[in-house]
Amino acid sequence: MSGHKCSYPWDLQDRYAQDKSVVNKMQQKYWETKQAFIKATGKKEDEHVVASDADLDAKLELFHSIQRTCLDLSKAIVLYQKRICFLSQEENELGKFLRSQGFQDKTRAGKMMQATGKALCFSSQQRLALRNPLCRFHQEVETFRHRAISDTWLTVNRMEQCRTEYRGALLWMKDVSQELDPDLYKQMEKFRKVQTQVRLAKKNFDKLKMDVCQKVDLLGASRCNLLSHMLATYQTTLLHFWEKTSHTMAAIHESFKGYQPYEFTTLKSLQDPMKKLVEKEEKKKINQQESTDAAVQEPSQLISLEEENQRKESSSFKTEDGKSILSALDKGSTHTACSGPIDELLDMKSEEGACLGPVAGTPEPEGADKDDLLLLSEIFNASSLEEGEFSKEWAAVFGDGQVKEPVPTMALGEPDPKAQTGSGFLPSQLLDQNMKDLQASLQEPAKAASDLTAWFSLFADLDPLSNPDAVGKTDKEHELLNA
């Protein structure tokens, strides 16, 4: 009996454990979903159940910290490599610049710049040696993330699933226990079935819980080992770099020790640098102006003398201008008294004499002037030669291209427009009148002389043997003149 009683629960447990009906699965999934919903919404769970998993929660926090810090470390290593390359490039450029400037400067300062530039170029090359341990460090961190952390993460996910099943089975057992009545054996089979599910879920959960705790501990230890090994390599390389750089810089400092190219002065008051620049520019302008004034002083004196002479001449011209114009008007009035041949020869217009005579109010010629005018009038009016054979020969040789233009005649009652300006002409008005007449004479075609004897009478002095009076005469008239 005892053996039979002892063997009964195990047989019953095996029977309930093998119960995989659809109803049992649906009930199990229902309580698992309810537990997941409680966890997602953050509702308060049973404090005793939560306290039993305190050590597991601590390990999970450590795992999430390792996962997060490894990701940040990988990003920091990549950024650090970029910054080292950028710093080495800038340091190399600075070294090249100092060397180029040092070659141009032949003083000791140029030698200092050359030595410093070489040291900077050497330092930039040695700094790039840090990339080798950093690249190795980055590879190790990435391997650690993709292998160790990923494997632990899968184990944690399986553990969380089993914990949800276990806590769901506890909720299911709690609900069934409320309807249980041990005295009447009511709901006993149902309670035993749920109790069997709780035991199986706890067994799986405890196994995965142990795996997670062990893997998290191993993960933390492996990370410490990785960091200590890789950081030791990086630290050694960094120390070698600073040692070489410090020796190079110290050697440059010792070689140029005692060289002091600067002279220091103490300022009593601060001044604006812009004000100093403005004062320097003003001084330069003043000095340039003084030098230019001294250089231009002698030529300016000569120019001033010439200007004074021109002013004197212009003043004398202004004072004598009126007198010269009046004398010209006097001569014009005397010419109007001459006979027709003179007017034809000189192309003088009767209107000019009419306008110049009354305006100028010239007196009659005196003494020798009267005798000269009378002599000229007698010479030109001595004989009136007609156009004869000479005029035909002249036309045959030179052509009859001279066209006579009719002189515009004015009515007797119309006054002369040139004489309407008034009796008192100013010198400027007389000059303008002469210029207008001159332009009109240039624009008009030259008039043909009606009588060619006037020309021969003027040029008779050139050939005294020829007789100008015989031009255009017949043979009988020649004989009479010769007699």
Swiss-Prot record:
Cellular component terms per the entry's GO annotation: cytoplasm; cytosol; Golgi apparatus; Golgi membrane; intracellular membrane-bounded organelle; secretory granule membrane; synaptic vesicle membrane
Chief subcellular location: cytoplasm
Residues covered by region (Disordered): 281-321
Biased amino acid composition, Basic and acidic residues: 308-321
KW Membrane (keyword) present: yes
Tissue: Expressed abundantly in pancreas, heart and brain with low levels of expression in lung, kidney, liver and thyroid.
Membrane topology reported for the UniProt record: Peripheral membrane protein
Role: May play a role in neurotransmitter secretion.
Name of the protein: Islet cell autoantigen 1
